[in-house]
């Protein structure tokens, strides 16, 4: 029998009733202000008592134990709630339904129609198990590859096959290049050989890869086993080797160059090879001349004419007026284009437009060009820098570095740490394309240590002039180098500049003639 006014019984009943179902722990907070068990152990002391604290034999405060139900026992799985029988049955029914979906029930039916013995025999036909004789005369792909293997093993350029990028397209950086082979016969040299190389390969590795692919395809003639005997030159789309530029540096990576068309040329100056003299044909035109390089004297005059016209028109399409070739010593006599250079017995020709003739004084016969002059003309396209002073109209001269090559002329200011640029205008770098250059003339030569030259170029449909000064030797070298470049290119801007200059001269001459005529009449 329990009394409801007994707080001890009420507290124990609440704790034992909620300990298995209350996850919040609020049952432990019931009657925390009036803990009956703690008050039993430590009764309140009367005021004035000095020994109010009750200590145990060991000097520690005595603990207390809450009342616990006898029915509740602590174990390892005390906090785990077991599944009910209903949940287990539902899980078993779900698995049975899934297994029934996977199974297919077929209802057995008796056969009504009777089939003949021949039809039953055709359902399960007996197969012949006789061994078939092997087919002879047909070669497998493996046998063919094994027969071709010795040819690849004998390739002296096998070490460069690792740079072949045909199997790495899309996964690794590769570069596709069309390579012309001038050492081929006249028919095969017109068609390029496509090579796919790894972008990380050097120029020397690309040369070895070209030689490896050339040998693997069985091309003729055979190549030299030494890769150093060959070099790569820049080539036009039709296979013509551009001799104005030096060959690519063999130690540079191939991804540094953006050319998609190259030519494999043999180094005649390599050890073990005989030297071969370069042959040049001079083609005179209205505003200069061109030097056309040929391999031998067996070349036809038609090929020389095509090269001369292409050199004259540059990147434009070879169309418009037609031209013919004439010997320099035989005016108005056209050269047979089907004949060879050897049969002409001449190395200097004139490029004349059809239905026209050479005017007197247009083509002046120059003296025979020596080999030193030819070398200077060819080396003029190589890059070279000069330190000169740029002359300005309203301010002091500026020290600049003048870089000249076959493509462009660059003017870069030389920075001087001592000179203060706070109160002066800083010179900006200038880049002039060679096709926009018009003239380079010697303006003044006072002494061997001081000379001035003028550089004229086209900028925004207007001709601008730049003046530079340096010692006489440097100025003469610059003027000669720029004029060699201008004579070999024959640009449109240069032709228009000379035409405008001639019109001004004619206008000035006619004006002075009319003035003299009026003064004579008076």
From Swiss-Prot:
Reported effect, residue 81 to T: In ovarian cancer; constitutive activation of mTORC2 signaling
Consequence of changing residue 312 to E: Decreased interaction with KRAS
Protein's membrane topology: Peripheral membrane protein
Principal location class: membrane
UniProt entry keywords in alphabetical sequence: Acetylation, Cell membrane, Cytoplasm, Endoplasmic reticulum, Endosome, Golgi apparatus, Lysosome, Membrane, Mitochondrion, Mitochondrion outer membrane, Nucleus, Phosphoprotein, Stress response
Superkingdom of the source species: Eukaryota
Annotated ranges, domain SIN1-type PH: 382-487
Region feature (Interaction with ATF2): 468-522
Any one GO BP annotation for this protein: negative regulation of Ras protein signal transduction
Domain comment (free text): The CRIM domain forms a ubiquitin-like fold with a characteristic acidic loop, which recognizes and binds AGC protein kinase family members substrates.
Function: Component of the mechanistic target of rapamycin complex 2 (mTORC2), which transduces signals from growth factors to pathways involved in proliferation, cytoskeletal organization, lipogenesis and anabolic output. In response to growth factors, mTORC2 phosphorylates and activates AGC protein kinase family members, including AKT (AKT1, AKT2 and AKT3), PKC (PRKCA, PRKCB and PRKCE) and SGK1. In contrast to mTORC1, mTORC2 is nutrient-insensitive.
Protein name per Swiss-Prot or TrEMBL: Target of rapamycin complex 2 subunit MAPKAP1
Organism, scientific name: Homo sapiens
Encoding gene per record: MAPKAP1
């Amino acid at each position: 029998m329990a009394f409801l006014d007994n707080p001890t019984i009420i507290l124990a009943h609440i704790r034992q009733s909620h300990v298995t179902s209350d996850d919040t722990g609020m049952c432990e907070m019931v009657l925390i202000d009036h803990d009956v068990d703690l008050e039993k152990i430590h009764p309140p002391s009367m005021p004035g008592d000095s020994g109010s604290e009750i200590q145990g034999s060991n000097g520690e405060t005595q603990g207390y134990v809450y009342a616990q139900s006898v029915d509740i026992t602590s174990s390892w799985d005390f906090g785990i709630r077991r599944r009910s029988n209903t949940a287990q049955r539902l899980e078993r029914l779900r698995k049975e339904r899934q297994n029934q979906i996977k199974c297919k029930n077929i209802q057995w039916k008796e056969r009504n129609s009777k089939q003949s013995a021949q039809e039953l025999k055709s359902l399960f036909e007996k197969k012949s198990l006789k061994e078939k004789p092997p087919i002879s005369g047909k070669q497998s792909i493996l046998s063919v590859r094994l027969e071709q293997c010795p040819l690849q093993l004998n390739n002296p350029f096998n070490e460069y096959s690792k740079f072949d990028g045909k199997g790495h397209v899309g996964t690794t950086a590769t570069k596709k290049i069309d390579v012309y082979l001038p050492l081929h016969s006249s028919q095969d040299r017109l068609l390029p050989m496509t090579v796919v190389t790894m972008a990380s390969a050097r120029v020397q590795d690309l040369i070895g890869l070209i030689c490896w692919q050339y040998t693997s395809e069985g091309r003729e003639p055979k190549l030299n086993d030494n890769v150093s005997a060959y070099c790569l030159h820049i080539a036009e789309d039709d296979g013509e080797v551009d001799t104005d530029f030096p060959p690519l540096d063999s130690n540079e990576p191939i991804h540094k160059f953006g050319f998609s068309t190259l030519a494999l040329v043999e180094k005649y100056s390599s050890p073990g090879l005989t030297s071969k003299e370069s042959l040049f044909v001079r083609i005179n035109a209205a505003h200069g001349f061109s030097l056309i390089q040929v391999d031998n004297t067996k070349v036809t005059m038609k090929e020389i004419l095509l090269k001369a016209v292409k050199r004259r028109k540059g990147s434009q399409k070879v169309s418009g007026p037609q031209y013919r070739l004439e010997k320099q010593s035989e005016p108005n006599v056209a050269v047979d284009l089907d004949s060879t250079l050897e049969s002409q017995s001449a190395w200097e020709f004139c490029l004349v437009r059809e239905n026209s003739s050479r005017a007197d004084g247009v083509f002046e016969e120059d003296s025979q060009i020596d080999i030193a002059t030819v070398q200077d003309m060819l080396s003029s396209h190589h890059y070279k820098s000069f330190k000169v002073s740029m002359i300005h109209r309203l301010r002091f001269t500026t020290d600049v570095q003048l870089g000249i090559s076959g493509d462009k002329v660059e003017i870069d200011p030389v920075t001087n740490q001592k000179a203060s640029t706070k109160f002066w205008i800083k010179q900006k770098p200038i880049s002039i394309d060679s096709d926009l250059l018009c003239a380079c003339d010697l303006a003044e030569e006072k002494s061997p240590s001081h000379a001035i030259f003028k550089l004229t170029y086209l900028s925004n449909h207007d001709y601008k002039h730049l003046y530079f000064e340096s010692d006489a030797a440097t100025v003469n070298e610059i003027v000669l180098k720029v004029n060699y470049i201008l004579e070999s290119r024959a640009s449109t801007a240069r032709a228009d500049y000379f035409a405008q200059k001639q019109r001004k001269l004619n206008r000035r001459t006619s004006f002075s003639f009319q003035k003299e005529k009026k003064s004579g009449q008076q």
